[in-house]
Amino acid sequence: MTVVRPTRITNGIRALRFASAEMTQAELAERIGVTRQTVIAIEQGRYSPSLEVAFKIARVFGVPLETVFQYPDDRSRRGGKPS
């Protein structure tokens, strides 16, 4: 049995949707070419989108990719030492 682990990548999609005239998950899904269930899974951190989908999401909101998705800096947890 496969165990689904939450991704370490966080995102601000829900906040961006509400800042964009309360765009629904279904509306976002249609604009980026995925299902509503996929948008839900991405928002909840249960699924990491492909690079193409990530860029489409950023484009929909007119923001840089880094505004939508954040990846924790491992160095901050290891005392600032790069890996």
Go through each PLM region and give its residues.
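Alpha-helical residues within the helix-turn-helix
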Residues: 18-19, 30, 59
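DNA major-groove recognition helix of helix-turn-helix/homeodomain DNA-binding modules
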Residues: 52-67
